[in-house]
Amino acid sequence: MWLAMPLIIASTLLVMKLTAFGTMKENIAKQFEIFGNKHTWAMTLLYIVTFGSFIGFSMALPLAITVIFGISHVSDAAGVIQHTLKNPNAPSALTYAWIGPFVGALIRPLGGWIADKVGGSIVTQVISAVMVFASAAVGYVMLLAYRSATPEQYFLVFMGLFVLLFAASGIGNGSTFRTIGVIFDRTQAGPVLGWTSAIAAYGAFIAPVVIGAQIKAATPELAMYGFAVFYALCLVLNWWFYLRKGAYVKNP
C-alpha cells in the first residue's frame, strides 16, 4: 500500500514525459526542471507539514473522536483493557469535528499577511515549533483517554490542542505559499505549487491510515508522536535552508 503512491506518481510523470510531443514536449521539459532543484523537495516537505497536516487531520479527527472518546476503555478480570463498551457520555464527532478545519481555513489569510510582514520562513519556523508541541501533547492526551473508563474528561483538552494544530497549519499554509513565490521565478513557481499541493494532498490518506492503524494496535499516541518527530525534522530543514547564516534566500 505504501509503495503504491510513489509508484503511481513516478509512473504518471514518466508517461507525461514519454508521450509529450512538439510544443508540449518543450513545456513539459521546462516544468520538469523543478525536480532538479533542491528547494522543490525542501518546500514539498514543508508544505506537507502545513497543507498536508490540515487536510490529513480534517479526515482523521472524526475517527479519533469516535473511537477514542466514543468507547469506555474498561479493564476485564485479567486486567486487560477492553475497547468494546460504548461510552454513554461520548462527544459527537458531528458536533465537534468541523471546528478544527474551519479555524484552519479561516486563519490561512492571516498566515499570508504575517508572512508578508516578517518573512515566510520565520512564520513557518514558529508554527512548526507549535505543531511539534501540540502533536506531542495530543498524543499524550490520547494515551490517557484510551486507558480511561471516562475518556470524555480529556476531550476539551484534546479538542483545544487539535484546534491549535489546525490554526498553526492554516497559518503555515499561507507562509509556505508565500515562500514558494519568493524562491522560484514565475516560470517555476506555478509548477512547484502544483507539485507540492498534489503531494501534500496525500495527507488526506496518510493521517487517517496511520492514526487508524495505531488505534487498532491500542497505541494511538504513537501516531501523534511520529507526526511530532516529522515536524521537528522539518523545523530543522526550514532553518537550514532559509534561516541560517548564509542561506540561499534568507527568510523568504
Mark where each language-model region is:
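A membrane-interface helix-boundary motif in multi-pass transporters
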Residues: 1-5, 212-231
